[in-house]
Curated annotation (Swiss-Prot):
Enzyme Commission designation: 4.1.1.48
Record organism: Bacteroides thetaiotaomicron (strain ATCC 29148 / DSM 2079 / JCM 5827 / CCUG 10774 / NCTC 10582 / VPI-5482 / E50)
Name the UniProt record assigns to this protein: Indole-3-glycerol phosphate synthase
Keyword Transcription: no
PANTHER family the record matches: INDOLE-3-GLYCEROL-PHOSPHATE SYNTHASE (PTHR22854:SF2), TRYPTOPHAN BIOSYNTHESIS PROTEIN (PTHR22854)
Keyword terms: Amino-acid biosynthesis, Aromatic amino acid biosynthesis, Decarboxylase, Lyase, Tryptophan biosynthesis
Domain of life: Bacteria
Pathway listed: Amino-acid biosynthesis; L-tryptophan biosynthesis; L-tryptophan from chorismate: step 4/5
Amino acid sequence: MKDILSEIIANKRFEVDLQKQAISIEQLQEGINEVPASRSMKRALASSDSGIIAEFKRRSPSKGWIKQEARPEEIVPSYLAAGASALSILTDEKFFGGSLKDIRTARPLVDVPIIRKDFIIDEYQLYQAKIVGADAVLLIAAALKQEKCQELAEQAHELGLEVLLEIHSAEELPYINSKIDMIGINNRNLGTFFTDVENSFRLAGQLPQDAVLVSESGISDPEVVKRLRTAGFRGFLIGETFMKTPQPGETLQNFLKAIQ
């Protein structure tokens, strides 16, 4: 880890410690039984014609504020109406302007899978994700030791959450195991935040043939999605391309027309 990612993880440890002081993990565990069964993001992507995972985020470390006043109750239903296969909701507050409340708000408004996108480092965050209504969580190889990543994946499954493992390089291929439901290739280096969509193509041939593959970050051209499909990808996580426009749902709708 280095640069921006190191700063994010250091802050995340501090943040989770504070949250544990406010609400214990035992209190979270008590609320798990009241949560409805999860929707399968893996199945949604495998059976989808579009594979678009539309992302709700207000800002990023590299771009600053994208849509500061964005409200999930307005944007999330528009994503669904446009044809999103699944939703990604950023819940990191300091660096991405999100919160768990965004998932809680969005959950009753849509019937597609929602993934909690955050920097998961502790099982406490898995309980949080389950309670607010997430169906899946992101585990980032660059942010976790391999043993810890597998441990969190197993704990996620125990809670009925699916796991999207995010890798960026061939060095992280050993993180892939039977506990991983989907494999995401991040086209953005989390140390420098430099983006290169060709990263997905470079790694695609080294991944299990039966894996549900997701390309993440830097996708703004419908032609790239067509190329990614040919390379074996079933999911395409896109946020800024939609969120930076006045009507994200309408932008998604036009994007989908262009990739059909």
